[in-house]
Amino acid sequence: MLITHGLPDRVSGNALRRSQELASSAEAAFRLVCEVEKWPVWLSFLVSSRRTDDGGPLALGSEVVLRGAIPGEREELYEVDQFLDGHIVSLVGAYSLRRRIDFRIERKRERSKIVVRVDYPAYGGMLGTLIDRMTARRRLDALLGDSLLHFKGLVEFKAGPEDILADF
């Protein structure tokens, strides 16, 4: 069941979008996406992330506080505005609707695919947009690609006691 509210999603031409094929089930990938406190482990552009509510399952209306990796950056409050269990988690900035982070898991038989879209405004007119594209947005795009490789490693890692010494 799709649970959503607010305006229909408008995709910005400036949004960063990356995807990664996963050799794991969509359920395992979505479980990892829903573990907000673990986001800094695989999202390398974040220093911290935490939920503001009681810690129940992530759902529509849940609030998440994120701090980026830029030194001196303040914490930003986001709200889950779209949630489709097993498939979509979409965050929108609580104070700026132009700040958005979307996670989508696509099922492909025994494999899956994660698609992440990050969008934020660039202020300062044409010059500010140009400077942002040459500096911060380029770095963020590279970090997003690295982050999805980290996610792939975490979600595909299967270590049981019998697997530890399997090579010996």
Outline where the language-model segments fall:
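Hydrophobic ligand-binding cavity/cleft-lining segments
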Residues: 1-54
